[in-house]
A protein has these predicted regions:
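Pyridoxal 5′-phosphate
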Residues: 1-393
Length: 393
């Protein structure tokens, strides 16, 4: 139904089921960037001629669009970055470095693990991991125990697992963390592609956002910073566009958000991100969530008909990604064969090696949906999987 809005599907006969890695881009996103490059390509926040002013206005409008999209309080609470990985690294270095303890979950992407290791944190030494149960559900009892034993910790938790699609109850996580004086960052890389996020309701202190996983351009992201923490945030990088005054003795920086956006930003990408969000507003999250829930259910039902299939969680409290293996087969081999049948999915550990190790596996076959996927895509996948299995067994 919605594939007509995405040029990729006009130019490809691939069944695209790798949306957790990146999503396709609607025409509005592509056209907004072409318009910038062809009609008013200029730098922002510097020159004062007409096209430069237009570029700055479009850039700042993108910040406003994002603010309204997630229901932030002020434009200044949104800082543009290259993506979620940079957003997490930014907060890890600029804010959370001095916290005695960082708490994450078992389901984290490497981008929410390695930055903490780079600070010298290891398991039990300033670094704690919340357990998950046999269905990959967040262990709230263990979380509360960690909070009690580590007062005023920094909590950094993914909203939706990129590897398994498991949804964490981030509102309850934030409530419990705040009860014990902790500060909370949410990795929202997978969030906005699948569900509406109301930052006021969630009450996260930081929320990391990806554009390219939300039908926007690559190389763009943002970090939401609750206003009260902006004054405590140190500049991660400095240089052009961050400066108020400079001499050879000292420098003073601008106020947020500009003090945190050093150098020329990905102007076209940020304008394109605003176009993606406006497109999603047009489609409507009621439609997006209803379509995805239906196709996700159908995917699960059809996969379960395949003999010897192994899952690691049920579909309750999950969305987007469905990970599995076939007993006796190597996931890489399956991936190679279905690729030859024009099915695009991902095999491997999905940048989540710790949870794979915990499950005693090297990786999975991952199918990840977006709202433009339909029953026909699932049917094509099932045919390809059955052929691959018959060839490998």
């Amino acid at each position: 139904m919605f594939k007509k809005d995405f040029p990729y599907f006009e130019n490809s006969d691939i069944i695209y089921l790798d949306n957790a890695a990146t999503t396709q881009k609607p025409k509005e996103v592509v056209n907004s960037q072409i318009e910038y490059y062809e009609h008013y390509c200029s730098n922002t926040h510097r020159s004062n001629f007409g096209h430069a002013n237009k570029a700055t206005q479009k850039f700042e409008n993108a910040r406003k669009v994002l603010k309204e999209f997630i229901n932030a309080s002020k434009n200044e609470e949104l800082i543009f970055t290259k993506g979620v990985s940079e957003s997490i690294n930014f907060i890890a270095e600029s804010f959370a470095k001095d916290f005695k303890t960082v708490i994450i979950s078992s389901l984290e992407h490497h981008s929410n693990i390695v930055p903490w290791h780079m600070q010298g944190r290891t398991l039990g030494a300033g670094f704690e991991v919340v357990k998950c149960d046999d269905n990959l559900s967040f262990d709230f009892a263990h979380f509360e125990e960690l909070l009690k034993n580590n007062p005023k910790a920094f909590v950094s938790i993914t909203h939706i697992s990129n590897a398994f699609g498991k949804i964490h109850d981030i509102k309850t996580i934030c409530e419990l963390a705040h009860k014990y004086g902790a500060v909370v960052m949410i990795d929202g890389a997978q969030s906005l592609a699948h569900m509406k996020v109301d930052i006021q309701s969630i009450d996260a202190d930081f929320f990391a956002i990806s554009a390219h996983k939300t039908f926007g351009p690559t190389g763009v992201g943002a970090i939401y910073v609750k206003e009260k923490y902006l004054k405590d945030l140190k500049a991660y990088q400095t240089g052009g566009a961050t400066i108020d005054q400079v001499d050879f003795e000292k420098s003073t920086l601008l106020d947020a958000p500009y003090k945190f956006e050093a150098g020329t930003q990905n102007i076209a990408g940020i304008i394109g991100f605003a176009a993606a969000l406006e497109y999603l507003n047009h489609v409507g999250y009621e439609n997006i969530e209803a379509i995805e829930k239906d196709v996700y259910q159908y995917l699960d039902e059809e996969l379960r008909k395949i003999p010897d299939i192994e899952f690691y969680n049920d579909i309750e409290d999950s969305i987007g990604s469905r990970s599995f293996n076939i007993k006796g087969l190597i996931h890489d081999d399956v991936g190679i064969l279905v690729d030859k049948m024009k099915i695009a999915l991902r095999v491997g550990h999905h940048c989540a090696q710790p949870i794979m190790n915990q499950l005693g596996i090297k990786g999975t076959i991952r199918v990840s949906l977006a709202f433009y996927n339909d029953y026909n895509d699932v049917d094509a996948l099932i045919v390809a999987l059955k052929k691959a299995i018959s060839m490998l067994k």
